[in-house]
A protein has these predicted regions:
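Acidic/glycine-enriched connector segments
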Residues: 2-5, 10-160, 167, 171, ...
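C-terminal amphipathic helix plus adjacent low-complexity
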Residues: 177-180
Length: 188
């Protein structure tokens, strides 16, 4: 199984949301499993891309029925809370709800057992900055040497697509022809 984290800002631009949905749909057909957090924006776009394919996603929630989503993955463990605390610069200032939001990021990167790293992270943050809740996950990914592709690093959607497809080809070298074929159909 190949797991990837699909995360990002609630304020992700519409054209990036469409790209996220298309990429998630493609990755689901390649038997990749999305790990995400059920938030509005990027998380929802990734989920929408693979929701019609059985067992194509693991949605980690900070609490039951977050955003009216049902998932067997809710209520972060004490271990996830401790791990999240390590990566947040002002943990003691967070509310209990904010701590749970940060803790669910650990699962997006390391799975339900907190021991099975995602192969890569696809995300969006404004200008590619390591900020907000997504920034917490990105700091963890960097520490765990998980490759990151941030769709916010470029303003031109065509450059984003080109770099994204190159990134995906690096992640799936054995499927380069299939990725290229999908890229060409996506661009038209």
């Amino acid at each position: 199984m190949i797991y990837y984290a699909g995360i990002g800002s609630r304020d992700t631009p519409a054209e990036i949301l469409i790209l996220m949905e298309n990429v998630a749909k493609y990755l689901a057909t390649q038997h990749c499993i999305l790990r995400s957090g059920g938030a509005n924006g990027a998380d929802t776009a990734f989920y929408n891309g693979c929701k019609n394919i059985k067992n194509a996603s693991e949605i980690y929630l900070p609490w039951k029925n977050f955003n009216n989503i049902e998932s067997k993955y809710s209520e972060p463990s004490e271990a996830a809370m401790k791990l999240a605390m390590k990566y947040h610069p002002a943990w003691e200032k967070l509310s209990q709800g904010a701590k749970k939001l940060q803790a669910r990021n650990c699962y997006q990167l390391l799975g339900n057992d907190l021991k099975t790293p995602s192969k890569f992270v696809l995300c969006y943050t404004k200008e590619g900055k390591v900020i907000g809740g997504t920034g917490q996950a990105l700091r963890m990914a960097i520490d765990y040497n998980i490759p990151i592709f941030n769709m916010g690093e470029e303003r031109d959607i065509n450059i984003v697509k080109s770099k994204l497809w190159s990134f995906l080809k690096e992640q799936f070298p054995q499927q380069t022809k299939k990725v290229v074929k999908t890229i060409e159909s996506e661009r038209s």
